[in-house]
Amino acid sequence: KNFTLSYKGFSIFCDSKSTLSLNFNHESSLLIYLFLSSSFCCFFKAVMYLEFMFELYVMRHAKSSWEDLNINDFERPLNKRGKKSAKKICEFFVKRKYRFEFALISSAKRTRSTFEILSKGIPEPKTTEYSKSLYLADEFTIINKIKKISSNYKSILLINHEPTVKNLVRYLTKNHETNNFKLMNYKFPTAAFAKIKFDIKGWDEIEKKGMLKKFIRPKDLQDSKE
């Protein structure tokens, strides 16, 4: 069956073969069409931008305690300063409405404790993975692990250790002339994090494709209220 839809000089005709034709009876109808077309194009571009924009947040664990030298390094807890710094970063995440779809956490106690503090404020990730292999991993081991994560996850929070976090950001990013990179490259302090964006189709394409967008240290933020 044929179908015709008309509105104020603008009509759409569809024949039995599903062929569409557009008619404009006056200039205003053409303007309406052009506006709708441009709006759709902007919407389509925005959707495509989001589809291929991936975000990786690389965070170093908060400050840990050295009081008990008999404790194995893997089991060292956070000290008071570390807990306060992790809380400040959590408040920053909450204020900026950051959401992480996948959390990849070293299973050392200080990294797990850092994530536990963050979890009190941020939305729960769709998937959280604790990995002992991250504890002594270099940046290439972590990259290979990230590459295996499904492209359905567009944002990843990684909490790990130095010097791996710094080396990872160095390797993945290409805008090394920025102040953010220079700060990060000078020192990646405890509880600091780097935000990296990738214009890619999947995590298997991340090598040297990232743009460092933020590098935030606890001392850059206002003190939390106790």
Where are these regions (language model features)?
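Internal catalytic or translocation cores that form aromatic/hydrophobic pockets or channels
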Residues: S133-Y171
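Domain-level recognition of soluble alpha/beta enzyme cores
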Residues: T173, E177-M211, F215
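Low-acidity, Ser/Thr- and Arg-rich intrinsically disordered low-complexity segments
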Residues: K1-S29, Y33, S37-C42
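Residue-level preference for the first positions of well-ordered beta-strands
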Residues: L56, K154-L157, F193
